[in-house]
């Protein structure tokens, strides 16, 4: 079974600003969820949260998602995603 990194644990580990927590959570759910309905709801939520953010904040949120995903891959014994050095 995969190791799971709880959202609060990830936010603390990577010091995600509270302003970005909602969109980072929604993006993570949209990527990780196996349930199509839940995935679509998460995408809609992410789009809603994105309306309140600047382009720089969106890029920052994306970089946190990549960092968290790579950390999850690492704790599950996988190598980091390629092409994400600048994220």
For every predicted segment, state its role.
Residues 37-77:
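Short, charge-rich amphipathic interface segments used for partner binding and complex assembly
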Residues 10, 25, 32, 56-58, ...:
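Intrinsic disorder/low-complexity segments in short proteins, especially the signal peptide
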Residues 2-37:
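N-terminal acidic leader/helix
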Residues 1-7, 74-87:
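Short intrinsically disordered terminal tails
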């Amino acid at each position: 079974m995969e190791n799971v990194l709880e959202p609060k644990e990830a936010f603390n580990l990577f010091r995600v600003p509270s302003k970005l927590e909602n969109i980072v959570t929604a993006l993570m759910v949209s990527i990780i969820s196996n349930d199509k309905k839940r995935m679509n709801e998460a995408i809609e939520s992410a789009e809603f949260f994105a309306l309140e953010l600047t382009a720089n904040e969106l890029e920052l949120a994306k970089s946190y998602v990549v960092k968290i995903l790579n950390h999850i891959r690492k704790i599950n014994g996988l190598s980091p995603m390629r092409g994400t050095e600048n994220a």
